[in-house]
Amino acid sequence: MKKTFFPAHLIGTVSAPASKSEAHRRMICAGLTKGETMLTGFMDSADMAATMRCLGALGSTFNRDGDTLTISGMQGKIAKMPVMDCGESGSTLRFFVPIALTVAGGTVLRMHGRLGSRPMDVYRDLFVPRGVRWYMGVGADGAAELTVRGKMEPGDYVLPGDVSSQFVSGLLFALPLLPGNSTLTVQQPVESESYIRMTIEAIAASGIEVQESNAFSWRIPGHQQYKSHSCHLNGDYSQAAVLCCAGALGHDITVTHLSSVTTQGDRAILRHLMALGATVEESDNHIRVKAGKLHGATLDMHDCPDIAPILALTAQLAEGESRLTHCGRLRLKECDRLAATVEILNLLGGNAQADGDDIVLHGVKQLRGGVTLPNYGDHRMVMLASIAATKCEQPIEMDGIEAIDKSWPEYLKVYQMLGGKCE
């Protein structure tokens, strides 16, 4: 699907969609129980559908009533080697490898888009020496398929910390279910620590005990059972970051449903925008970011890489030079987001460059627009383009807009409600 985005002024109040990262985790905890759990504030997306399919393959069932999702946990006997369609969701894929080994003795995980090319060697190197059979192939329809067969055993597990925290979270879900005690150690430095904390918070709410013995080292008792824990899903700082950056660029937007008490690493968007010179007003779970005299800054993306593209746009329109550091993991997302961000900004008339794992931006006063952007197949690039267009002299065109369905299907409706123009 192709859309043209036009220069516009955005104004209004928006409720942040439910946190995708939190929803993944709460759904999995609910699916691993034997009871019923209600999650309120739930929002559909392609990634949520992927996690629901995988839980369904393990015997969970779902009922949707408005924004309430009722999950009935694993029922009956689990099929041997269930097939799990992960869509394009990296979280779903990496969470369910150890879960499936633990509760089903293996699985066939189907992957679409670029998901089949995203790194999985951390698990392969961990599980194959422990007797798990591992095979990467291609299905009859051309989709990548990962087949894992075997059983996880209690023991001492060590993971490198300079990889996606999704591998750590996958083990945290599975290890408590094993018939014996285990330890999990993550070697420092650790990527996206906040997402590990979010997983621990979710499993603890479901009655799982995890004992932290040292920094990034946990003792995990076995023979545990997940207990039903209904909750309301918090708003998503990762999605709200797009609107907060729009505020920093001169639009008048208030975002609601954003708790100041959160393990979401992408709350760092507020700190980073203030470092660029924006003003942040926060009260009663409402956030309004106002433009100031934006200036260059060095911003560390180590714990919040997903907000780097929209921050790069904001920094591009600030005075002076900015540097976004530790952006290397952007290369391993739905597209090479580091290269795509630099390409988009330059095509629009900015001055951006990649410097190793950093993005360097030389501020410009105005973006030209007037171009057709490539189809990146990435929801973050769609959001970036839509906000960039509001600050361009000429409209911009982009194909592949349907990629937005992966995380926030209602985004374009929200964008237009705020005054955004696209057709």
Cite the ranges covered by each PLM segment.
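Short, structured segments at the rim of ligand-binding sites
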Residues: 1-423
